[in-house]
Amino acid sequence: APEIDSQVKNTPRRPLTLSKLPSLKYVYTIGDKPVEGLQAFSALQIEPTEALKSQLEAVESNLSADDNINIQFTSGTTGNPKGATLTHRNILNNGLLVSQAMRFTHKDKLCIPVPLYHCFGMVLGNLVCLASGSCAVFPGESFDPETTLRTVEEEKCTGLHGVPTMFIAELE
């Protein structure tokens, strides 16, 4: 983040060049406060044309809440690899119900150090935040106990996801 912060302050509206994220060219902000050097996400929003509306309606007419959206690979309780097929309804309800069980609101911040390629990070992390309007905080590229705890403190996170081995590492 310091590298991004430095470039944002010194780069008026042109592509960024970051050593750790060479493919990242633009950073967009969400919210009411403009940030110099960054583009507002609202600038990407367009009024849909009739052609786009028709295209969306065609896709919607062929979708069902019970259609498969994702195959989550797992070893489950047996230890044998398999694909668990999830539907739109599975994933959205899971995110919504867990956000309600956690009593998360737009005032909360959830630290998500778990991998996004797993249901824990993607559904119980991202979708919980989307369903509740809370803020998703990603402490780093991969799990590091010290970085995670520092991020929780600095960002004033009100929730922290993890598995037992992660919490043990944080306690050590």
Regions found by a protein language model. Give the residues of each.
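Conserved adenylate-forming
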Residues: 1-43, 140-172
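Conserved AMP-binding/adenylation subdomain of ANL enzymes
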Residues: 92-109, 119-159, 168
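Proline-centered helix-kink/hinge sites
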Residues: 81-83, 115, 129, 145, ...
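Conserved pre-ATP/AMP-binding loop-to-beta segment of ANL
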Residues: 20-24, 29, 35, 39-73, ...
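Conserved structural elements of the adenylate-forming
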Residues: 51-53, 65, 70, 84-105, ...
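Conserved S/T- and glycine-rich ATP-binding loop of Class I adenylate-forming
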Residues: 68, 74-77, 110, 116, ...
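Conserved phosphate-binding and hydrolysis motifs of nucleotide-dependent enzymes
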Residues: 75-83, 88, 163
